[in-house]
UniProtKB/Swiss-Prot annotation:
InterPro entries: Big_2 (IPR003343), Capsid_Gp10A/Gp10B-like_dom (IPR049301), Capsid_Gp10A/Gp10B_dom (IPR039009), Invasin/intimin_cell_adhesion (IPR008964). Assembles with the major capsid protein to form an icosahedral capsid with a T=7 symmetry, about 60 nm in diameter, and consisting of 415 capsid proteins. The major and minor capsid proteins are incorporated into the capsid in about a 90/10 ratio respectively. Once the capsid is formed, encapsidates one single copy of the viral genome. The minor capsid protein is produced by a -1 ribosomal frameshift near the C-terminus of the ORF coding for the major capsid protein, producing a protein with a C-terminal extension compared to the major capsid protein. The major capsid protein is produced by conventional translation of the same ORF. This is Minor capsid protein. It holds the Pfam family Big_2.
Length: 433
């Protein structure tokens, strides 16, 4: 049979003077668009801080100018005697290097595969770059707040960063989402005033926090949702604005930037979020509730914007697709940055370390029931338990009790939020007449 003639080659660039060697040339632009879309969708800091592009060089300078004061001039006095110089300094942000993410798609695997993986690969490339950029910006924001007293102002008198500690409620606990949300809102009230005292503009203020704390703020506002229609959308569970801050939930709040390896704990991480709080480290992973800022607090310098490159790896019979950018991140204005932290001694809710049941064995007759409760250790851990039965036709757990359904043996198992289990063996005998 003769070879088939014709057939569309949609990916080949067949324009006049163009090379047709690359069969995927026209597909590349779609792929690149998907990377850009994924980056824009995932990044939460890019539209909320200072961005500056440079054509060449290894760094960018941001001038800082201080303030002066006015004074009355009496007859006969000389302005030279009253003049006060306006102080100057600068902040410099250096390019971190070339950040990359790539995939290698082998021809044979691509041919045998029955579903499209490129769309998901593109999303992962874009999201990895976005999370690295976000992590770096947020780590720099935390770094501003942690500046030592000797350097926590660009120029003396311009203002210092603000660190606010949640106040424990007189009744209830910060482990209660509603109480936690109320406490965060109370500190955002103080944060608003702190920035304004530093002459930080009222617009473009942002509060970054974790999904747990974001949900806590929602829980605190929800009972009065009718009165807060301008602040939140109860139907979608989103917050628009609290105390002049755009509230943004960030799952990767404390992840930090990229490193020299692509492991979960990268080597030589360039912008690491502080791990442990101390007398000198006010904000760290173990106590941060959220970071607040004006968009001028942190800056990013772009040498090479997000771009895509595809290379044919003939020796591997594969296509390599690379997403990359060259940027640098750094703090600019300490007076426009701040953080809310947990009180000393109050930390992240610990994971359960064990679970025990009120009974290890139980004997019932058909139709009877008996209480069975579980206790999670430690007491301040997540106390939620999920219950299951190995034989639901014999016995089940319902509303704190084991209910006997039929003759036989069943194991009633309680499982903690992190997968620890405890079981009670239940024997069900026939009911006597």
């Amino acid at each position: 049979m003769a070879n088939i003639q014709g057939g569309q080659q949609i990916g080949t660039n067949q324009g006049k003077g163009q090379s047709a060697a690359d069969k995927l040339a026209l597909f590349l632009k779609v792929f690149g668009g998907e990377v850009l879309t994924a980056f824009a969708r995932t990044s939460v800091t890019m539209p909320r801080h200072m961005l500056r592009s440079i054509a060449s060089g290894k760094s960018a300078q941001f001038p800082v100018i201080g303030r002066t004061k006015a004074a009355y001039l009496k007859p006969g006095e000389n302005l030279d005697d009253k003049r006060k110089d306006i102080k100057h300094t600068e902040k410099v942000i250096h390019i971190d290097g070339l950040l990359t993410a790539d995939v290698l798609i082998y021809d044979i695997e691509d041919a045998m595969n029955h579903y499209d993986v490129r769309a998901e690969y593109t999303a992962q490339l874009g999201e990895s770059l976005a999370m690295a950029a976000d992590g770096a910006v947020l780590a720099e924001l935390a770094g501003l707040v942690n500046l030592p007293d000797g350097s926590n102002e660009n120029i003396e008198g311009l203002g210092k960063p603000t660190v606010l500690t949640l106040v424990k409620p007189t009744t209830g606990s910060l482990t209660d989402p509603v109480e936690l949300g109320k406490a965060i809102i109370a500190q955002l009230t103080i944060a608003r005033a702190s920035l304004t005292k530093n002459y930080v503009p009222a617009a473009d203020r942002t509060f970054y926090t974790t999904p747990d704390n974001y949900s806590a703020i929602l829980a605190a506002l929800m009972p009065n949702a009718a009165n807060y229609q301008a602040l939140l959308d109860p139907e979608r569970g989103t917050i628009r604005n609290v105390m002049g801050f755009e509230v943004v939930e960030v799952p990767h709040l404390t992840a930090g930037g990229a490193g020299d390896t692509r492991e979960d704990a990268p080597a030589d991480q360039k912008h690491a979020f502080p791990a442990t709080s101390s007398t000198t480290v006010k904000v760290a992973l173990d106590n941060v509730v959220g970071l607040f800022q004006h968009r001028s607090a942190v800056g990013t310098v772009k040498l090479k914007d997000l771009a895509l490159e595809r290379a044919r790896r003939a020796n591997y019979q594969a296509d390599q697709i690379i997403a990359k950018y060259a940027m640098g991140h750094g703090g600019l204005r300490p007076e426009a940055a701040g953080a809310i932290v947990l009180p000393k001694g109050v930390g992240v809710i610990p994971d359960p370390t064990g679970v025990t049941l009120s009974q290890k064995t139980m004997t019932l007759v058909e139709g009877a029931s008996r209480a069975l409760t579980g206790t999670v250790q430690p007491s301040d851990a997540n106390q939620s338990l999920s219950w299951s039965s190995s034989a639901e036709d014999v016995a089940v757990w319902e509303a704190g009790k084991v209910v006997a359904k039929g003759v036989g043996t069943a194991d009633i198992t309680a499982t903690t939020s992190n997968g620890l289990i405890a079981s009670c063996k239940v024997i069900v005998n026939a009911a006597t007449s």
